[in-house]
Amino acid sequence: MENGVVMEDRLIAEEIKKLKEERNAIILAHFYTRGEVREFADFVGDSLSLCREAVNSKADVIVFAGVHFMAESASILSPEKSVLLPVPEAGCPMADMVTVETLRKEKEKHPDAAVVCYVNSSAAVKAESDICCTSSNAVNVVNSVENREIIFVPDKNLGAFVSLHTDKKIHLRPGFCHVHENIGKEDIEELKNLHPEAEFLAHPECRPEVMSFADHILSTSGIVKEAGRSESTEFIIGTEKEIVQSLKRKYPDRKFYPVSKKAVCYNMKKVTLESILNSLQNMEYEVQVPEHVRAKAKKALDRMLSVSGT
């Protein structure tokens, strides 16, 4: 049965490769997607690197192996390209935790504040924001803004982390990533007892009490880089557990322990090779943003990319 599945995946992969050439398409995949999807992708990265790749790519078609807000960001930045989301139901619960209405109310309460919006948000919310950020560049973005007050949406944990690295007043909203929010300090304590020499690399979407245990607090791409340059040979990885497989392949001489077997983003796992093939065959499901929203949202994303050195 396993050989049959492998053969089927190979046939699907061959067909995808053929269609990619015909349509001048590339596949962009997030670190949290399935292993077979990442293996076949043209580029694998976190939100910031995927944004950059979408802008710089010469492809006519971008197949986004990720969730809706990621494909939306690619479409905002590159409207001349067809951006396909293989599974339209692949959403991000955190992105839905802030709406245009709630953001406008926050702006009324804090009229002197600039709005810094995590990219894990809708195009409409980005359009209401002054600048976007990712977990890679949130501190730099906030410190680049002239305003002394910041409305930070939607992730309260990332916002709390940023507040430790700025003298600006940060107004937070109660949004969170369920994957990171569900990581508890008891998970860390258990693994630290089992692997006392291991470095704990935590994502800033984790709760503050979890981050307090961390040796380093880093974005997903930052975790990958730190695992390669550190003198340590053992690591506890405080983010979605899929990244552990990538780390093991990249650094086979090192040991990696997922902080929790429950740290799974099921929306990312919805994307399969079959759904990518269907997407390329039928040119679906194309993500488009209304121009009046796209133009405003693009300004916020462009400002972020200029701060990030893109």
UniProtKB/Swiss-Prot annotation:
EC primary class: transferase
Pathway the protein takes part in: Cofactor biosynthesis; NAD(+) biosynthesis; quinolinate from iminoaspartate: step 1/1
Cofactor detail note: Binds 1 [4Fe-4S] cluster per subunit.
Catalytically driven reaction(s): iminosuccinate + dihydroxyacetone phosphate = quinolinate + phosphate + 2 H2O + H(+)
Stored InterPro entries: NadA (IPR003473), NadA_sf (IPR036094), Quinolinate_synth_type2 (IPR023066)
Keyword Transferase: yes
EC number: 2.5.1.72
Binding site for [4Fe-4S] cluster: C92, C177, C265
Assigned protein family: Belongs to the quinolinate synthase family. Type 2 subfamily.
NCBIfam families the record matches: nadA (TIGR00550), PRK09375.1-2 (NF006878)
Name this polypeptide is given: Quinolinate synthase 2
